[in-house]
Regions:
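N-terminal signal-anchor/signal peptide hydrophobic helix marking the start
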Residues: 1-8
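N-terminal helix-rich module
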Residues: 12, 16-46, 50, 54-140
């Protein structure tokens, strides 16, 4: 009898926890994707300062973006320049991104081609903005 009561309590607890988790997962994925994109943008800014050349971010579609170490500062992808392609949906399946522009970080840490990046999923959307001073900021 005691075993049946314990199993009943455990099944109710599991059911409530499962329901709560299923509503929270999209929110956690969106926040994780925002952290991923923001950290990549800040890292590109820091690399521009350290390496003294332009770092350019190209948003290719609603899930991929490319980080270019533009050695000759021409804004184009040339042979021999390091490229790092990121797929946001590799870790955050239901998150999509849209960008208003392809930003560049200059050797002084400032930015050109200012951009707003919007990340969206079923829990909502968040916006990352890049100011002319190079500040990367998240807005809800």
């Amino acid at each position: 009898m005691e075993l049946i009561i314990v199993l009943g309590i455990m099944s109710i607890t599991f059911m409530l926890t499962n329901t709560w988790l299923s509503t929270q997962l999209p929110h956690w994925r969106l926040n994780g994707a925002v952290r991923q994109v923001m950290s990549d943008l800040v890292a590109a800014k820091m690399n521009a300062v350290v390496e003294r050349n332009r770092q350019r971010i190209f948003f290719q579609d609603n899930r991929h973006y490319l980080i270019l170490d533009d050695k000759n500062n021409n804004g184009q992808i040339d042979a021999g320049e390091h490229q790092d392609v990121r797929d946001i949906q590799a870790d955050y399946q239901d998150v999509t991104l849209t960008a208003s522009n392809n930003p560049s970080f200059l050797p002084r840490g400032t930015a050109s081609n200012l951009a707003s990046i919007i990340l969206t999923n079923s829990s909502g959307s968040k916006k990352i903005t890049i100011s002319i001073t190079g500040r990367v900021k998240v807005q809800s």
